[in-house]
Amino acid sequence: MRHATSPIVFCFLIFLVMNHVKGQAKKKRCPIGLHTYGKCGTDRAKFCFSEIESKLSFSKQVLNTISSCRCDDDRQGNKDLYWCQCDRREGRPCPAN
């Protein structure tokens, strides 16, 4: 009987450890953003990356951590605006609000 209960107790302990680890999620990295006049290009992600690369002064090391970009068109009054946001794979986490 002792041999039968050992695996059950072991599985229960593993279950507790796995659930404890799930509660400690990785903090999200702060995105890089740009909001200015104009419109997104046809290839929105590529346009956004090139705009951030040319208009903001980030090192190549920071630019290499970018995993994805998105561009959203907006309109304020009679002026076109766009909002670029690029997410990063690594870097400093966003501060808690």
Curated annotation (Swiss-Prot):
InterPro entries: SCRL. Disulfide bonds join C30-C94, C40-C71, C48-C84, C69-C86. Keywords: Antimicrobial, Disulfide bond, Fungicide, Plant defense, Secreted, Signal. Pfam families: SCRL. GO terms for cellular component: extracellular region. The keyword Secreted applies. Transmembrane segments: none annotated. Coiled coil: none annotated. It is found in: Secreted. Residues 1-23 form the signal peptide. GO terms for biological process: defense response to fungus; killing of cells of another organism; signal transduction. It comes from the Eukaryota. Its main location: secreted. Belongs to the DEFL family. This is Putative defensin-like protein 237. The gene is SCRL21.
